[in-house]
Design a protein with these regions (language model features):
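Vicinal oxygen chelate
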Residues: 45, 100-106, 131-166
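Hydrophobic faces of well-ordered beta-strands that scaffold small-molecule active sites
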Residues: 1-6, 23-27, 63, 116
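Core segments of cupin and vicinal oxygen chelate
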Residues: 64-103, 125-128, 132, 143-150
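Conserved, mostly hydrophobic/aromatic
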Residues: 16, 51
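Short beta->alpha linker loops
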Residues: 7-8, 122
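N-terminal beta-strand motif that seeds the catalytic metal site of vicinal oxygen chelate
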Residues: 52-77, 111-118
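Mid-chain, well-packed structural core segment of small domains
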Residues: 112-140
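Glycine-rich phosphate-binding active-site loops on the catalytic face of alpha/beta enzymes
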Residues: 9-12, 21-44
Length: 166
């Protein structure tokens, strides 16, 4: 495994981290020497936090809506699709609306109201960094394929929604 430190910046950090051989990146783009000399720790912290946020690439994946049964799911999917002029794709356990922005569950799934999927560039790195921010994970929900974590749920709901990283 390698740690790259030369030529890395906010625009290309994820290109480096996309290689299995690269375990970490670093460099002066995250912590300028003049900031260290000046003791500008708040600025250094902000730059480092920005670097981590860029690396994680967290963004909304989809919203899952729990329905009581298949009939309610079909009606809900049709309503959302008609309202937003989106396509419907029926699956085994759910119905997707749009480009998978909405997942309408055919029976109640995780979360009181449903679930929210958060996309990330690397689930394992996101588990570590979000854990540092106080997020607890349901380790029993961890889904691993080819040695990499591909999904995991937060331990706690937020506003009646289960959250998971994918």
């Amino acid at each position: 495994k390698w740690m790259c430190t030369g030529g890395v910046n906010a625009k290309n950090v994820n290109n480096y981290l996309g290689y299995n051989q690269i375990i970490a990146v670093g460099g002066t783009w995250m912590c300028k020497s003049d900031k260290i000399k000046a003791g500008a720790w708040d600025e250094i912290t902000a730059m480092s936090r920005e670097a981590v946020d860029v690396m994680l690439g967290l963004e909304l994946g989809h919203i899952g809506i729990n329905c009581a049964d298949e009939a309610e799911a079909a009606k809900t999917a049709e309503t959302i699709a008609n309202l937003l002029s989106m396509a419907v794709k029926v699956g085994n356990s759910s119905i997707f609306v749009g480009k998978k922005e909405f997942e309408i569950m055919k029976k109640p799934g995780r979360g009181t109201n449903g679930h929210i999927a958060i996309l990330t560039n690397n689930v394992d790195r996101a588990i570590y960094h979000l854990g540092q921010r106080g997020v607890k994970f349901d380790m029993d929900s961890k889904n691993v394929k080819d040695g990499k974590t591909v999904a995991i749920y937060f331990a706690d709901e937020i506003a009646g929604f289960a959250f998971h990283l994918v």
